[in-house]
C-alpha cells in the first residue's frame, strides 16, 4: 500500500481566498513547519489548500514584501524560499523577542478570563506530553499557541503584530534545530511559572517568566 503524504496546510473554503492563503502560510511558518532554505512551490501550496494558484501567488508575494520569504529563482514558477538566517540575524530576532514579549505578557493579565486561561493551560499540558514523546514538530505548534494565547490577551494589536513578525522569521530556524532540541525541565519550569502568574493575575511575574523562557532558548 502506498504511503499517503499528509498536506501541511489545511484546506480552506472558497471565499476570501487571498486572506485565507496568507493566514495559512503564516500559521505554517509560525509553527515551524518549513525549514530554512526550503522551497515553497505555488502549485503544491494551492493543492494543499484546495484553491487556485492566483491567491497563493498573491499571498506569497505579500510575505516576500514583508521580508518573511525570499523570492524564488528563475525557473521556480513564481514560488519562494524560506530565508537562511545567520547567527547574527537570529540573535537580533531573539533580542527583539526579549524586548517585546514581556511587555505583552504583563499587559495580558488584566484581560485573562478563566476560559482563556484554561485554553492556555491546555497548551502547556500538551507541551509536556509532546516533549516526552519527542513529537517535536507538534510541540513547537503547541508552544506557539501557548505564547500567542497569552500575548493576544494584551489587546495591543500593533505590539502583537510586531511579535508575530519576529516569530515568522524565527519559526523555520527553530524547526531546523528540532532534531537536536530537547525541551526539558528548565523550559517547563519557565512555562509553568508563566501559567501560574497568569492565573494569579501577576503581570510582573508573568513578564519575568517569559523573559527567562526566551533567554534560555
PLM features per residue range, with description:
Residues 1-12, 203-217:
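C-terminal effector-binding regulatory domain of bacterial HTH transcription factors
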Residues 1-106, 110:
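Short linear motifs at protein or domain termini
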Residues 114-175, 190-193, 205-216:
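Conserved amphipathic alpha-helical segments that form helical-bundle/coiled-coil interaction surfaces
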Residues 91-98, 178, 207, 211:
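Short amphipathic alpha-helical segments with heptad-repeat character
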Residues 28, 32, 71, 166-173, ...:
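A short secondary-structure junction motif
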Residues 16, 71, 117-118, 182-186:
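Short helix-capping and inter-helix turn/linker motifs at the boundaries of alpha-helical repeat units
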Residues 85-91, 105-112, 130-134, 155, ...:
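A ubiquitous short alpha-helical element
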Amino acid at each position: 500500500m502506498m504511503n499517503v503524504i499528509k498536506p501541511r496546510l489545511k484546506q480552506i473554503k472558497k471565499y476570501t481566498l487571498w486572506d485565507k492563503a496568507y493566514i495559512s502560510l503564516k500559521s505554517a511558518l509560525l509553527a515551524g513547519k518549513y525549514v530554512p532554505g526550503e522551497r515553497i512551490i505555488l502549485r503544491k501550496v494551492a493543492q494543499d489548500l484546495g484553491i487556485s494558484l492566483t491567491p497563493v501567488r498573491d499571498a506569497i508575494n505579500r510575505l516576500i514584501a514583508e521580508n518573511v520569504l525570499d523570492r524564488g529563482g528563475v525557473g521556480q514558477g513564481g514560488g519562494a524560499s524560506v530565508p537562511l538566517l545567520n547567527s547574527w540575524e537570529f540573535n537580533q530576532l531573539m533580542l527583539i523577542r526579549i524586548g517585546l514579549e514581556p511587555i505583552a505578557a504583563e499587559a495580558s493579565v488584566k484581560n485573562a478570563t478563566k476560559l482563556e486561561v484554561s485554553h492556555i493551560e491546555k497548551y502547556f499540558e500538551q507541551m509536556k506530553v509532546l516533549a516526552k514523546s519527542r513529537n517535536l514538530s507538534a510541540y513547537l505548534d503547541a508552544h506557539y499557541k501557548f505564547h500567542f494565547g497569552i500575548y493576544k490577551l494584551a489587546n495591543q494589536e500593533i505590539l502583537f503584530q510586531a511579535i508575530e513578525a519576529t516569530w515568522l522569521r524565527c519559526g523555520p530556524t527553530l524547526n531546523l534545530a528540532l532534531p537536536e532540541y530537547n525541551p526539558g525541565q528548565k523550559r517547563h519550569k519557565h512555562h509553568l511559572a508563566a501559567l501560574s502568574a497568569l492565573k494569579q493575575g501577576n503581570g510582573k511575574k508573568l513578564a519575568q517568566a517569559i523573559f527567562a523562557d526566551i533567554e534560555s532558548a
